[in-house]
């Protein structure tokens, strides 16, 4: 049994205090790094056996007593003991400061999981007999025909089953910040701002098997393409939140107003491989793929996938802002608190163009109440 450790460490260095504007400025830098391991479930490691069948003969005359169907039943053991735990490494560095009741912090982080779980396909060659029922003399039958002496040909079929692999990668990185002021006496209000820029990438670290959905001479396509680059996406966004917290103690009122801004959000699909690096035949043999040869081959050219450049362009959604309001009232010596909130009471969501299409956006506000008791 192999042990898996999840070490983590954090360190903060407080720098010497300095005077700024006649007041103390306390500041420091910090960092941390750690690993997190996620173990596969039992059904990933030991899934149930997979059974399949292939029709070898289907003799189906009008006379019911003469009918016979012969199947080859095969069993696949999908035991997956080679699957490893998914490992995630995260580190961060940052700085913080406090001055005159105001605080500020900024943090950069990166999180990389290179062995995440995903489903993949494995192809197996199954050899079955294809009996020639045209050789059966129905007039000589007293019952279902015998397979002995019946001519047949061996036919190889590629069959697939899914299993879990360590073929997924997730990379997250971003910048977070927060800032808050002391309560401004003139209006008894504290200002708090925070936000983050986040970029997430999803990638497949293992080759993809692809079989064109076409028929060749009335039979399923005989080859499986093996592609290196496939199904990846990345997303990024920048969001901020500005909150004004105003208290009126004499009336027992608290006003909270937040301005939530999404400055942009975007996504892009990673380009897929147009040409496979190799391909698999029905016998399970891997052959190198020559694009020049495949262009003129009526069968191999189906492995060349269509590539549309517009599908992989970066798509960005522009600025949008929502304003939320919450009013709280304390009653009966602070034993009862009643709050009314209205989210998206005001919004800024301008229309924008995406290519030749105009995208119109709308926001639906909603409201509610909260009632808290203290006994």
Regions found by a protein language model. Give the residues of each.
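Transmembrane beta-barrel strands of outer-membrane/channel proteins
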Residues: 1, 29-35, 44-46, 97, ...
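Structural signature of Gram-negative outer-membrane beta-barrels, strongest in the C-terminal barrel
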Residues: 1-103, 107-111
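Residues on the lipid-exposed face of transmembrane beta-strands in outer-membrane beta-barrel proteins
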Residues: 9-15, 93-99, 108, 175-181, ...
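Gram-negative outer-membrane beta-barrel transporters
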Residues: 130-273
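Outer-membrane beta-barrel translocator domains and adjoining extracellular loop/strand segments
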Residues: 1-5, 42-48, 108, 117-123, ...
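Extracytoplasmic loops and strand-loop junctions of Gram-negative outer membrane beta-barrel proteins
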Residues: 1, 60, 72-79, 156-164, ...
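Residues that define the transmembrane beta-barrel architecture of outer-membrane proteins
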Residues: 3-7, 87-91, 169-175, 234-240, ...
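C-terminal beta-signal and adjacent terminal beta-strands/loops
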Residues: 260-308, 315-322, 326-375
């Amino acid at each position: 049994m192999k042990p898996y450790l999840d070490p983590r460490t954090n360190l903060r260095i407080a720098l010497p205090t300095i005077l700024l504007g006649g007041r103390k400025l306390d500041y420091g830098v910090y960092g941390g790094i750690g690993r997190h391991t996620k173990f596969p479930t039992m059904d990933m490691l030991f899934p149930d056996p997979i059974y399949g069948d292939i029709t070898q003969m289907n003799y189906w005359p009008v006379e019911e007593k003469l009918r016979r169907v012969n199947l080859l039943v095969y069993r696949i053991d999908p035991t997956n003991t080679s699957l490893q735990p998914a490992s995630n490494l995260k580190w961060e560095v940052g700085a913080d400061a406090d001055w005159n009741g105001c605080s500020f912090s900024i943090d950069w982080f990166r999180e990389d999981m290179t062995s995440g779980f995903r489903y993949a396909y494995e192809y197996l060659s199954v050899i079955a007999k294809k009996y020639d029922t045209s050789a059966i003399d129905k007039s000589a039958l007293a019952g279902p025909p015998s397979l002995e002496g019946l001519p047949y040909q061996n036919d190889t079929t590629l069959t697939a089953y899914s299993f879990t692999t360590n073929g997924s990668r997730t990379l997250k990185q971003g910048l977070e910040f927060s800032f808050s002021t002391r309560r401004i006496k003139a209006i008894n209000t504290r200002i708090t701002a925070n936000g983050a820029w986040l970029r997430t990438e999803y990638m497949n670290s293992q080759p993809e098997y692809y079989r064109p959905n076409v028929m060749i001479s009335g039979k399923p396509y005989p080859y499986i393409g093996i592609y290196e680059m496939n199904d990846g996406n990345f997303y990024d966004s920048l969001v901020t939140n500005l909150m004004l917290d105003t208290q009126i103690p004499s009336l027992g009122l608290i006003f909270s107003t937040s301005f939530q801004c999404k400055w942009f959000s975007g996504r892009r699909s990673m380009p897929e491989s147009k040409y496979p690096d190799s391909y698999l035949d029905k016998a399970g043999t891997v052959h190198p793929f020559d694009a020049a040869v495949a262009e003129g081959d009526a069968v191999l050219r189906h492995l060349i996938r269509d590539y549309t450049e517009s599908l992989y362009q970066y798509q960005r959604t522009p600025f949008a802002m929502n304003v939320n309001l919450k009013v709280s009232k304390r009653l009966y010596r602070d034993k009862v608190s009643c709050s009314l909130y209205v989210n998206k009471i005001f919004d800024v969501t301008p229309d924008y163009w995406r290519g030749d299409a105009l995208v119109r956006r709308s926001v639906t506000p909603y409201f509610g109440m909260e009632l808290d008791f203290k006994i």
